[in-house]
Every structure is written in structure tokens, then in C-alpha cells.
Regions:
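Domain-level signal for soluble alpha/beta catalytic cores
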Residues: 1-397
Length: 397
């Protein structure tokens, strides 16, 4: 019987102690860099060891650190995967106008630019829903702006992430750490570089140091890049597919620049449409972006395949030319609903992809991070359903 491997998209529920400890941390003089202490580091190390063991018990075979090194000071937080990067880059400072409150921007054909977060098209289509029902939580720090040259300063922080995860792994066990991709990091407001494209490339050069550190440690680095799909919603008015593909090709080229020379099998790309609980009616279809995404020189791709907006798109993977060595990590349990998936549904979802690439090239995963998006008890029940579904699929593939 083939064993179906399992993993997660990264974020897992933080413990109450970890959330409270993050909330109690002080800021450096810049107003957004969180200070660390030896006591805090010990708390994180212990929490990572526990979350790794809990993943194993649930049936996860490729574990991560739950993103516990990325600060969450509130139980509901959709942004820790991004806001952690502010702690790890030079060239940022707090300004009156930032990515969250900047004025709207209008794009023109062949000249696409991201508009403000408040001007996103799904939000404009459903203003009452976003005003009343879409909870986005709070991130642990304020949003800075690029006001100088971007460079990497996260060496100690990524070394801590690596140390904590490696200490939590069993002998010979592989693990992964997440890191933001250049295109997503560059969505902070740019007041320094001559163009948005230059801004993306600057982040690529800086973040390469983080990817290299994780890879050199023998771990898998997962590049979180919701921007590849999600930017479509942040361009107003809606762009043509060809213009959006050209816009996205720059972001994929920046990924390839940043991961050049790293072992392909140690690089995983996470593609998603944003994990907030909104209508997502303006999400771009997978078939329009997959050919561009497949230009990324990565060993595996993690993506949403377990929610009502994107589950039907599993067929697209069978309609494109996939590299023979590309591993697919489809989301088969989702952050998008409180309903816990039945293991037989999980198994069916896995089997669809096994039919396309073979069971040895499928690693069953979560759609997106679960931490900060669903109640912790639901998150762990979903991971148990993931583990059981993978066991059932193994008997059928």
C-alpha cells in the first residue's frame, strides 16, 4: 500500500501563552520591530516542540513550526505570514500613509498597479459584507512603508526559527519553514524605488538570504505568495487576463532570481487567493494563472483545492503540461469553513490528484494556514481528518 504524505500550509493555532507573550513584547525605537528576550525564545522553543509532536499525532508526515516564530498577538490574525517580514528588513519606517490607508489607484491597460486594500474589487462588490461580517483580526505590528534601500536584517530571527524546528524534529525527519515571497513582501507602500517592479526585485535580493539560510539548514523552504493569484482582486478596474499574466510573470521571475542555486526539492511554493472569510467572487480562475505559476523553478506547489470557490479546479492540473518531478500539495481540508471535512471526502480529493500525477507526487495539505483563521479545536480536528483521509486514500490509490 502506498503511503500518502501529508503536510500543512504553515500557520497553526498559537497557544494562549504564546499570544499573550507576543502581546507583552515591547517595540524598538522604530515603533514596529518587536524585541525578544531569552525567556520568550524558550517559550517559543517549547511551543514548537509541542506543535511538531501534535502534528505527528494527527497524521502529518511533513511538519512545520506552525509559524510560531511569526508574531501573533491576537487569536484572529490573517496577516502574521506577511507582517513578520517587517521585522527582518532594513529600509522600512512608519509613515502617515501606508498600505492599509493609502488612496485608491486606477490601473490602465498594459499599466497595472495595485490599488489600496480598501479599494479591492471583492470589497467594492460586497461593501456591507466587509463592513459587518468579514473579520480580519489584528496583526501584531503597524504596517511600515519602504522609505530606503531594502536589505535583510533577519539573520538572528531565521536562525531561531531553524534552531527551534530542528530541535523538534525526530532523527532523520524532514521539516519545513515558511518565508514570504518577494511579490507579496513588496505590497507594502513604496516611497523609495522608482518603480513597483524595482521594489519587487529589491525584496527578492533581500529575502534570498532567508531562503538560503533555511535551505542550507537542510529544511524545505515554503515561499508564501498569495500575491500571484490575489493581486487580481487588488487591481481596479479588472485587468485583462493577458495584462495580469504579464504583471504576474515579474513576480515569478523574482522568485526564480531569489531561489537560484537552491536544491529544487527543498523549495515549495504556496499559491492562494487570500485566506480571509469573504465572498471571493472576484478571485481569478486557476486556469488563467497556472501556466505562469508553473514557470517557478520549485519542487512542489501548495495550493487551495478544498473550498467551494476553487475545489472544482482540480481538472486544470490535468490539462497543462506538468514537469515530471513536480510534487503537488493540494489543500484537502480548508481554513474557509468551520465544518470539519469527512475523511472520505479528504480521501476523494487526494485521489483526484493521484489520478493526475500518481500518489507518490501528492502531499495532502491544508488550503491555507489554519492558525488565526478557525478555532484551534476545529483546526486540530481538520488535521486529524487530513491524516485519516490520507490513510484511506492510500488503500485506494
Amino acid at each position: 500500500v502506498t503511503r500518502i504524505q501529508t503536510t500543512t500550509a504553515g500557520s497553526l493555532p498559537r497557544t494562549t501563552a504564546l499570544i499573550e507573550a507576543n502581546a507583552a513584547r515591547t517595540f524598538a525605537d522604530d515603533g514596529f520591530t518587536l524585541q525578544s528576550t531569552p525567556e520568550f525564545e524558550r517559550l517559543v522553543a517549547g511551543a514548537v516542540a509541542e506543535v511538531a509532536e501534535r502534528q505527528r499525532r494527527a497524521g502529518v508526515t511533513l511538519v512545520g513550526d506552525g509559524e510560531f516564530g511569526k508574531a501573533m498577538s491576537n487569536p484572529v490574525d490573517y496577516g502574521a505570514w506577511w507582517s513578520y517580514s517587517f521585522q527582518r528588513a532594513n529600509g522600512l519606517s512608519l509613515t502617515e500613509v501606508n498600505a492599509l490607508n493609502e488612496p485608491p489607484v486606477r490601473s490602465e491597460p498594459a499599466n497595472l498597479r495595485l490599488t489600496s486594500f480598501l479599494d479591492r474589487r471583492d470589497r467594492q462588490l460586497f461593501p456591507a459584507v466587509y463592513a459587518e461580517a468579514v473579520e480580519l483580526g489584528r496583526v501584531a505590528t503597524a504596517f511600515p512603508t519602504t522609505t530606503g534601500p531594502i536589505s535583510y536584517r533577519g539573520h538572528d530571527a531565521v536562525a531561531s526559527d531553524i534552531r527551534h524546528l530542528k530541535a523538534a524534529l525526530l532523527e532523520g525527519e524532514q521539516g519545513f519553514l515558511t518565508a514570504i515571497a518577494p511579490g507579496s513582501a513588496a505590497r507594502v507602500r513604496n516611497e523609495y524605488y522608482a518603480s513597483d517592479e524595482e521594489h519587487v526585485w529589491a525584496w527578492a535580493d533581500a529575502l534570498r538570504e532567508e531562503y538560503q539560510a533555511i535551505s542550507d539548514a537542510g529544511l524545505i523552504v515554503q515561499l508564501d505568495d498569495p500575491s500571484l493569484a490575489e493581486n487580481f482582486d487588488q487591481i481596479n478596474p479588472e485587468p485583462s487576463v493577458s495584462d495580469y499574466q504579464a504583471f504576474t510573470e515579474v513576480r515569478v521571475a523574482a522568485i526564480n532570481h531569489a531561489i537560484r542555486g537552491l536544491p529544487k526539492e527543498q523549495v515549495r511554493l504556496h499559491l492562494c487567493w487570500g485566506s480571509w472569510h469573504g465572498p471571493h467572487a472576484t478571485d481569478i480562475e486557476l486556469r488563467h494563472i497556472l501556466p505562469v505559476v508553473l514557470e517557478a523553478n520549485v519542487g512542489s506547489i501548495s495550493f487551495e483545492a478544498g473550498n467551494v470557490r476553487h475545489e472544482h479546479e482540480f481538472t486544470v492540473w490535468g490539462e497543462v503540461d506538468l514537469p515530471d518531478d513536480l510534487v503537488l500539495a493540494p489543500g484537502v481540508v480548508s481554513h474557509a469553513t468551520n465544518v470539519v471535512e469527512h475523511p472520505d471526502l479528504v480521501s476523494q480529493r487526494i485521489e483526484r490528484f493521484a489520478d493526475i500525477v500518481g500518489p507518490d507526487r501528492v502531499v495532502a495539505s491544508t488550503d491555507c494556514g489554519l492558525g488565526g483563521r478557525v478555532h484551534p479545536d476545529i483546526a486540530w480536528a481538520k488535521l486529524e481528518a487530513l491524516g485519516e483521509g490520507a490513510r484511506r486514500a492510500a488503500t485506494r490509490c
